[in-house]
Structures are given as C-alpha cells and as structure tokens.
Amino acid sequence: MAATALSMSILRAPPPCFSSPLRLRVAVAKPLAAPMRRQLLRAQATYNVKLITPEGEVELQVPDDVYILDFAEEEGIDLPFSCRAGSCSSCAGKVVSGSVDQSDQSFLNDNQVADGWVLTCAAYPTSDVVIETHKEDDLL
C-alpha cells in the first residue's frame, strides 16, 4: 500500500520546474547519455588481419579504430613492442598485402612506409591485411 501511495503522489505532483531537484538531475543526465547513444550507433568496420609470426599464422577480426598491436594483445598474442607510440622500431612488421593507417607513427620515413614497413603499435587496418611480424632486425 505504501508503494501505491508513493507512486500516486508522484503522479499527482505538479510538473517539475528547473528549481526542482528532480528536474535538475534529468537535465544533467541527458547530456551525459547522448554521447553514449551516438557511440553505440556508430558504424564500425572490422578487417581480417593475418599476422605471420615466428610461431605461426594468426587471423584476427580487428576494428578499424583499434591499433593492431593492442587488439592482438587483447587476444593473447605475444608481439614485440617497446614505446607503444610509433617512435621506435620494436614492433616493426612488413605488410605483405592490404593496407593500414599508421599516420600516428613518427619513426618510419616515407620510403620505408612505401616499401611496406609498419609499426603495429600505431597502425589501424584500413582493409584486410597480411603482416609479417617480428621484423625489427630486417628494418635496421
């Protein structure tokens, strides 16, 4: 009965105004919820990324907004890394086919990128891609 009385009193209450604590909570909550809805509605591409490692080949479905190294680690794949910022060559690999966006890296020069070198810590897939990993010694 108390629950019914409480809900009935809420229904009979006058419409909330901006000075009402309830209205204030609603006004604050709406802007926080809106970005989450937009994020959930964002279309996201995923690409087949094949990593050719010394231990064998691994295929992953990597989202287009996640670094290849980060996703591989989440899946339990051990890849070399050091800086995680694209400013060294520890995670260097060689693109066999496909393409990546590695505009966040600062170590490789234009010729090395054109030759297919990739830093997996700063590379997003932009198509299905095959990458030979553990190639730092070949790069240097």
UniProtKB/Swiss-Prot annotation:
InterPro entries: 2Fe-2S_ferredoxin-like_sf, 2Fe-2S_ferredoxin-type, 2Fe2S_fd_BS, Beta-grasp_dom_sf, Fd_pln. Gene3D superfamilies: 3.10.20.30. The keyword Iron applies. One of its GO terms (biological process) is response to light stimulus. Residues 1-44 form a transit peptide. Its main location: plastid. GO terms for molecular function: 2 iron, 2 sulfur cluster binding; electron transfer activity; metal ion binding. Residues 47-137 form the 2Fe-2S ferredoxin-type domain. CDD domains: fer2. SUPFAM superfamilies: 2Fe-2S ferredoxin-like (SSF54292). Its cofactor is [2Fe-2S] cluster. GO terms for cellular component: chloroplast; chloroplast stroma. The keyword Endoplasmic reticulum does not apply. It is found in: Plastid, Chloroplast. Expressed almost exclusively in bundle-sheath. Keywords: 2Fe-2S, Chloroplast, Electron transport, Iron, Iron-sulfur, Metal-binding, Plastid, Transit peptide, Transport. [2Fe-2S] cluster binds at C83, C88, C91, C121. Binds 1 [2Fe-2S] cluster. PANTHER family: FERREDOXIN (PTHR43112), FERREDOXIN-2, CHLOROPLASTIC (PTHR43112:SF3). Belongs to the 2Fe2S plant-type ferredoxin family. Ferredoxins are iron-sulfur proteins that transfer electrons in a wide variety of metabolic reactions. Occupies a key position both for transferring the photoreducing power to Fd-NADP(+) oxidoreductase (FNR), hence the formation of NADPH, and for mediating the cyclic electron flow around photosystem I (PSI). This is Ferredoxin-2, chloroplastic. It comes from Zea mays (Maize). The lineage of its organism: Eukaryota, Viridiplantae, Streptophyta, Embryophyta, Tracheophyta. The gene is FDX2.
